[in-house]
Amino acid sequence: MTSKDETPDQEVYAFNADISQLLSLIINAFYSNKEIFLRELISNASDALEKIRYEAIKDPKQIEDQPDYYIRLYADKNNNTLTIEDSGIGMTKADLVNNLGTIAKSGTRAFMEALQAGSDMSMIGQFGVGFYSAYLVADKVTVVSKNNADDQYVWESTASGHFTVKKDDSHEPLKRGTRLILHLKEDQTEYLEERRLKELVKKHSEFISFPISLSVEKTQETEVTDDEAELDEDKKPEEEKPKDDKVEDVTDEKVTDVTDEEEKKEEKKKKKRKVTNVTREWEMLNKQKPIWMRLPSEVTNEEYAAFYKNLTNDWEDHLAVKHFSVEGQLEFKALLFVPRRAPFDMFESRKKKNNIKLYVRRVFIMDDCEELIPEWLSFVKGVVDSEDLPLNISRETLQQNKILKVIRKNLVKKCLELFNELTEKKEDFKKFYEQFSKNLKLGIHEDNANRSKIAELLRFETTKSGDELVSLKEYVDRMKSDQKYVYYITGESKQSVASSPFLETLRARDYEVLYMTDPIDEYAVQQIKEFEGKKLKCCTKEGLDLDEGEDEKKSFEALKEEMEPLCKHIKEVLHDKVEKVVCGTRFTDSPCALVTSEFGWSANMERIMKAQALRDSSITSYMLSKKIMEINPRHSIMKELKTRAANDKTDKTVKDLVWLLYDTALLTSGFNLDEPTQFGNRIYRMIKLGLSLDDEEHVEEDSSMPPLDEPVVDSKMEEVD
C-alpha cells in the first residue's frame, strides 16, 4: 500500500515495505566493500544509454536535443556531493515513483534473504536493486531526470521511509537523461578524491561502452610583470591620486628628457611573478576500449600490445595472444596473453591463482575467480566477457555455475591451441618453454583430461640432441626398430645424468635417452604412462627389459650361475642395506650400480623428498624401498672379487672392498651416502694398502706442541657489571 501526501511544491510517497526493509539493512549494517556503489550506478547509466541508443535506431528524432552519449562524474568537496550524470533515456514522473520506491522489484526480498544469510553485498545488482547501493555512502540521494515524453522531475529521499517527487525548476536543465546527486556521509569523503574515483572506474567500469568523464581540476602557472599592478593603480579614482601643483607646472622639456636608455632600465626593473590559475575540465577515464569486442582481423599488433600493457602493467610486450569468441547456447568473448617472462613469485602459495579478469557485459566482476582457469595456467593473462552470467554473481554461486565450467573448458582448449601455434615459431617457443615449462609439467600432473595434449608440448635434452630440445613425438619418430620403450633418466643436472653408468648399454645399442633434470619432471613422468603407444621406461629402475639374442641369453645365464656365490657373499656383507644382489646387463664399463624397484622412488626423487621440510614420514618410509645391487658379471673387479671371496670369506680386505663398492655405487647411482665418515675411512685404508702401510699404525703426536695449561680454578677476569 502506497500513501501519498501532496503539498503545493511536492508529492510525498511512502516506500514499499520490502524496499524500506532493504534500505534499513543497507544503512545500518557494515559492509567493507562499499565501493561497489559506483559500479552499480555507472552500470545503470550505461543501461539507460543502451535504451536510448536502441530507441534512436527506430526513431532518430529521439536524440535530436542531445545527440551525445556520455556518463559524467562531478565531485563537489564544498557541498560534499558526488554527481553521476548520463544522457540516457531518462525517467518520467511515473518512472521515478514506481521504479524508485513504490513498486518493489521481484528480486528485492530474495536479495534481502541472501544478504541476511551472509552473501556478498556486491550481489545487489543481480536482483535489480543496484540503485539502492547509493545509500552505502550517501545519507541523502537526489535524482534529477528528464525523459523525452515528460518534463524534468526531481526525486529525493533520505531513506527514512518516504521520498518526494516534484517538477524540477531549481536544478540545471537536462536535455535528456538522469543526474544522481549523492550527499555523502561524513566518513565517506574519500569518494570525492579524483584519485579514488579514477581507481574505481579503472577497476570496475573501464570497458563500459560509453565514455565516462570526470571533472578534474587543472592548475596552470603563468608569469606576469608588474604592469598589471600599475594598470590597477591607473584605474584608481582621480581623487585618490596625489596632486602636486609643481608637477603640473613642469614643462614639456623635462618630460621629454627621458632617454631610450632610461626606458630600457625601467623595463629591467619591472619584477615578474607567477600567477596560479585553477580551471576545471572533463577528463575521459575509459579511453582503453574493449578490443575483445572487435573482430581479431580488425585489431593490430600495436593495439594488442597497448591493451596488454594497460591490463597488466607489464613493461614488455606480450609473447603471444589468442583472441576468440564462443557463440551458440553460451556466448562469451576472451582475449588471452602469454607474457614474455614468468613472475618471480609464480608458485607462491599465497599468490593469486589466476590473472584472468571476468567481465559480464563489459562490467568488471572479479579477478580472483579460482574456478575460471586451472592453476597450471595461472601465468596466462587476459579478460573474459560473458553475456550469459548474471551481473554481480557471488563467488559462492559462481563456483557452482555450469556456465563457468564451460568457459573454463574453452579457455584451456584455446590456451593449448595458442601454445601449439607457438611451436611453429621456434625462437618464440624456446622463450616460452624456458619461462613456463614448469607450468606445463604441473598441467601433466593435474589435468587428466588434457594430459596427452600437454605432453606433446614437452621438450627435453637427450643423449643425441646436444643443446637442442626434443619433443616426445620427435623422439618416437626416430626410435630404433628394435626399441620397445621411450627411455629416460632423472637427475640433478645434465652433467650428472650424462655420465651415469645406467646409460652404458643403451648408448652401446644406439638408443636415445631423455634427460629429465627438472625436479618437477619426477612428478610429471609418473602421470605419462605412454606416448603414441610407446611406454616410458626409467633406466635407473629394475626391469630394463632389453632384447637379447639366444646366444647372448645362454652366455649371460652361464655368467649368472658363475657369479651366484659372489652375489650371496655381497648380500651377507651388506645385510639389510640392499634387498638383493643380482647380475645385470645394463653396464659395459661400470662394475655395479644400485637400482630401485619399478614402483618405488628413483634416486633423484628420494633426494627431492628428503629435502621437503613438511614431508609425511610414513609415506617416505614406505616409498624408500630397499635398493637392488646390480653387478656387471663381465667386469674384472667382480671376477677378482669372486676369486678372493671364494678363497677366504672372512678376508677383511674383501669386506672393505664390498662396502667400498656399495658406497661408490650409491654415489654413481645418484644417492646420498648413508655414512660419509665410514666411506672416508675405507678410502684411507685403501690408500694405506696401496702405499704398503700398516693399517694399525697410529699417527705420531706432534712433540713441538706445548702442553695444555692446568685448568684455572678461580677466574682472574674482572667482573663485568
Curated annotation (Swiss-Prot):
Compartment list: Cytoplasm
Pfam families: HATPase_c_3, HSP90
Cited CDD domains: HATPase_Hsp90-like
Keywords, in A-Z order: ATP-binding, Chaperone, Cytoplasm, Nucleotide-binding, Stress response
Sequence motif TPR repeat-binding, residues: 717-721
Predominant subcellular localization, coarse grouping: cytoplasm
Family: Belongs to the heat shock protein 90 family.
HAMAP family assigned to the protein according to its UniProt record, in alphabetical order: HSP90 (MF_00505)
Protein's name according to its UniProt entry: Heat shock protein 90
Source species: Theileria parva
